[in-house]
Amino acid sequence: MNDQQQQQWAQAIENARQQAQPKPSCPQDWGATLKDAYIVQGLGLQQRPDDAVIGFKGALTNQRVQETFGTTEPALGLLFASSARPERVIQSADFTKGMIETELGFVLSRRITAPIESVSALQSCFDGICLMVELVDLNFSQFPPSLPDLIMHNAAAAQFLKGAVSPIMDPDSLTLTLESAGDTRHRGAALDVLGGQWKALHWMVNQALALGHTLLPGQVLMTGSVGSVQPLKAGDYVLTGGDLAPLIFRVV
């Protein structure tokens, strides 16, 4: 893709988002690469000047999800302030093909300006952990999308919920369980994300820095789907994980 195509496509994506249209696929003859995809994702920030980036999301960090999209690589997305749902009520009418992902979030305790060389150094950068739920919308005009298309559409990000923050504990020892109407919808081991939560965070931090993003205290990094992805259906839900505060939410 050339510069003009990148700008043009960033605008097309934003138009589709604002008009709640299916996420368009980039013309194949433009030959979009992963580098192009992240440039377009970054240009999307210019389309939303009043919508702060309050964190980052890992996508395709789970082998099962990677298989769905035919890739072996993770992807990075942005968490916008407008996507947060602190009231913990999700309107299903906001989605065309909504899905529920259960995840862990990690809260930064300091600014990071240089790549982190080791997991041990990384651990000192975070002081909080919480349960999170991400609501994605897989309303792509072509499914599954290519990896560049997924990245350009900010990894299908739509809305997210953040649980109460607890002091850092061993995240890889956690099992996340999603329940609704007395039934267990799924149960997943946090260790399944990129072979470990700290490994996932290590990749996310260094990838964000490589893309020119700023990592600031208070931002949350959501590491990717733990367990299977569930279709968005009306009901009351409870997400639990070890000693972390349960995350209770409703879909209407």
How should each PLM-predicted stretch be described?
Residues 2-196, 234, 238, 243-252:
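Catalytic-core "active-site belt" of small-molecule-metabolizing enzymes
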Residues 197-232:
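A conserved acidic, glycine/proline-rich C-terminal tail/linker
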